[in-house]
Amino acid sequence: MKLVYEVLDEVKKSRKKEDKVRILKENESWALKDIIKGSMDESVQWNLPGGSPPYNPSEGHNAPTSLFREHKKFKYFVKGVPASDGMNPIKRESLFIGLIEGIHPEDAKLVIAMINKTKPAGLTKPLVDEAFPGLVK
């Protein structure tokens, strides 16, 4: 299974829309869809400061965990979700830093871009709608 950043790199390098849709569909995962939704859906607002927090990226080949596991923690960072709104901001930011330090550094860059609402290169709303209907509002 490809890491999320590998899938999105492949999409970015593809020229044809049908190839991009095929790549997304073949590599469908909740982690991939969460990154896309969190980056592109305006109804998702993050309960974290903008920019990039100070963190120590993991060594890619030795990352202790993966985005496939850690994406489940995104609920602690979304505004309007009780798990996030009820959490102490320092604890929330500490949890976020732990998440990005534990995953592959390229996936960590995607997560940071996501909370800053920077959409992955090569993706458009119509493309995402074709691959994953209804994912992005």
Language model features by range: what are they?
Residues 1-137:
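N-terminal nucleic-acid-engaging modules of covalent nucleotidyltransferase systems
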